[in-house]
Amino acid sequence: MKYAGFKENIKLSKLGLGAMRLPQTEPGLAKPVDEPKARELIDYCMAHGVNYYDTAYIYHGGKSETILGQALSGYPRDSYYVADKFNVQANPDYQFQFQDQLDRLGMEYIDFYLLHGITDLTAADYESCGCISYFQEQKKQGKIRHFGFSFHGTPDCLRRLLETYSWDFVQIQLNYYDWYQGTAKQQYEILREHDVPVMVMEPVHGGMLASLPEDCMELLPKGNGSPAAWALRFVMDLPGIAVVLSGMSDMEQVKENIITADSGQSLTGAELSQLARISEKLRKKIAVPCTGCRYCCDNCPQGLDIPSLLSAYNDYRDEAAALGDKNMAVWRLHRLKALEKEKQPAACMGCGSCTAHCPQGLDIPAYMQEMSALLQ
């Protein structure tokens, strides 16, 4: 296993296990975790050098933390690192949630603690509730070793957070699709500019880059692994990446990802060009080809942040396509429930002003209506 230096001589495995997609007893939304299989995956990861395990208060209906803690309980506490997250939407009582997490994990401290999924729209909730100063105090007391946040917002919001508070690390969505077609490259460069270690989530874009359409497969560089392996290699090759998380749900994924992380092979310029071409083909296939120009926002009587809403919709459609199950992908829209009601898709009046001003001619009210129905 390849390792990356963090702070204070800490060495983190380049591959981390994301405990959001643990094996289930049967396919489907909110089905029970297959605990024996989950433990088998974790044991295999530990045996092959993976030492970073990421969970959250809401994963697997609150069961992820307990299962992870039990699986790791047989190993020396200094042989692994656990990352956990405070979710203000799940329970704004941050003191209760933090203690509940320690109890679920069966641990006296959490190595890497994050504010969960900050966006431009939810940043104020985290900043105003008092949780930041509380968690900084927990760090002083040793109950948190490193404090950061996971992020799904704009580069401007990321820069503001970095310049306002002190963080030990930040976790962003980074993959070659978002690098070439989204804002991942900008976010990465901002973090490098501020000398903040980067933890990576969604290296295969919710599964989209692991299940490429045929015309994209033809462009994939020959040899050296599957589409998922190429996606992981792209991210692991970047300087300053501390950990690349993968939500692995079966042993085949675990074994392949460990082999990829062990290889440490750098991508050539020609290979990077091929991945860029694949990302462009995927962009043209994406459900809603919104470019984020915001002409729609300037003319929306409800003041909706339409590009952000459509971005959530695209995440939902991407995951649904990757999983082959729309119901299992609806969670991608759940972050919109954190918005004030007048900013949610249901607030759309259907006036059509957005479509009239959209250079792409998108039927935005139809997407708003679909999201509203899915969120009910």
Q: For each of these PLM feature ranges, what is it?
A:
Residues 1-79, 140:
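N-terminal binding-site loop/beta-alpha segment at the start of enzyme catalytic domains
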Residues 5, 12-16, 51-52, 79-83, ...:
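Structural preference for beta-strand elements that scaffold enzyme active sites
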Residues 7-11, 47, 69-79, 99-108, ...:
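Acidic (Asp/Glu)-rich catalytic clusters
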Residues 21-36, 83-93, 123-124, 215-225:
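Active-site mouth loops of central-metabolism enzymes
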Residues 31-45, 91-106, 152-161, 227-234:
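Short, acidic/polar
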Residues 56-65, 87-94, 121-124, 155, ...:
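Acidic-and-aromatic substrate-binding clefts and catalytic sites of carbohydrate-active enzymes
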Residues 102-123:
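Active-site groove signature of glycoside hydrolases
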Residues 118-291, 295-304, 308-311, 318-333, ...:
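Beta/alpha (TIM)-barrel catalytic core signal, keyed to glycine-rich beta->alpha loops juxtaposed to Asp/Glu
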